Amino acid sequence: MPGSPSARSVTPASPAASSALPVSPVGRPSSLTEPEATVSGSSSPADSSTSPSSSPLQAAPSTSVVPVSRPHTRSRSGIFKPKERKDGTVAWLAACLAAAVADPSSEPRSYQAALRIPHWREAMEQEFHALLRNKTWTLVPPPPRVNVIDSKWVFKVKKHSDGSIERYKARLVARGFRQRHGLDYEDTFSPVVKPTTIRLLLSIVVSRGWSLRQLDVQNTFLHGFLEEEVYMKQPPGFSNPDRPDYICRLSKALYGLKQAPRAWHARLASALRAHGFVPSTADTSLFLLQKPEVTMYLLVYVDDIILVSSSQYAADALVCSLGADFAVKDLGKLHYFLGVEVTSRATGLVLTQKKYSLELLQRAGMLKCKPTTTPMSSTDKITAVDGELLSPADATEYRSIVGGLQYLTITRPDISYAVNRVCQYLQAPRDTHWAAIKRILRYVQFTLTFGMHIRPTSSRVLSAFSDADWAGSPDDRRSTGGYAVFFGPNLIAWSARKQATVSRSSTEAEYKAVANATA
């Protein structure tokens, strides 16, 4: 009935009237899709019945028009159902399998594809059985009113420093972003060793001729004990056939959990204290053991450990003792640590990041760029307002490349100042800042083999040098200070950054630089 409040649709009186309606981008009249649209005409059904010449759209009361929204489909959410073939296989699974056969270094994007590839299926089974042996969880019926997270498989091809394949790694990762603070986790901070500590210890090792070994702990986070109750669904592809409805109550940490790094560090620190080690007050990831007959240091960066010992026998005994508690793998002499290549020479150790530099250049699309001999030009005056703003996608890429350059400064003090300059514009990068990054990358291309040379020395003297300009920043007139700290002839720490406050004189800026160098 025209005047019925239950009417839910309106039909135009004629094609002409239909074509006169404004059409929304989704192909529907905008007056029907936009809730804020108003309908002209009388609000009384009696009035509308007395106007036979008016169109049905005008005659319908405003309350009868129901806004129509686009349906929330799977394609709009980026969810696509795999196309099944007549033989029962799935198109994208077959494509992944063909890619894995053609390229052994390819990484599958789903656990369904990995299960069809022999070496990845073996890696998944090894990870799953390691979790069972470690008693990571216990299958329990789902308790009421608990937060149950899920998990996913992550695949990674581990490579040597020369690019050759070391092993295929499958890792079960919990979706920790579904955890709730105060319910599933509390504190999350976990320390890692500082680069300055690494360089200082390497300088001591070279000078004293001590043993230098590298250890790796397999399934690192699985050794940490959880203090909170965390529940997780059974791993995809490895559900218990007898108890498919049960869930996992985690008793030990798992990769992806918010508190996993902290739980692992607490477990490792407890084990090292049992062996007589104490953490350093300057760096809590440095553990020391000093006895009359032996001196040992352990540098811990999550699961990567550097073992320094004055006695080879004591180092072997410690590795065996730690192997009783953790799955410790002795990698032998230090050669590759956290993306840093360590080369032993008669004149000491050489630290380089050639492999990482090439990966960074490839990520930036500048692997075949024209090299340059300096990271910055003395005539370049970079400011925060010159140039056009980058698009959101380019700004994200800018921040990613800057972060990669920051990590490259671990062994490259020559680019420290230039990288600090481009770091000052992460909030709103412009095309002039991007040009500065490209020049730094061109310099990296020219100096791929540059690094640090740590020489043996009998000196135990710490020397520090500092310098500062005055009001050098054109944006806020703050000064830039820098320092370099040497242990004997070896450079172990440096910095070049803008000072936190404005200096009223060059003397004040210099004093601030000295304070930063000695802090």
Task: Locate predicted features.
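Short coil/turn segments at secondary-structure boundaries
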Residues: 76, 165-166, 184-185, 225-227, ...
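Catalytic palm active-site di-aspartate
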Residues: 216-219, 249-257, 279-309, 322, ...
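Short beta-strand
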Residues: 139-144, 214, 278-280, 298-299, ...
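Generic non-transmembrane alpha-helical segments
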Residues: 267, 271-275, 321, 325, ...
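Active-site-proximal acidic secondary-structure segment that organizes catalysis
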Residues: 233, 308-331
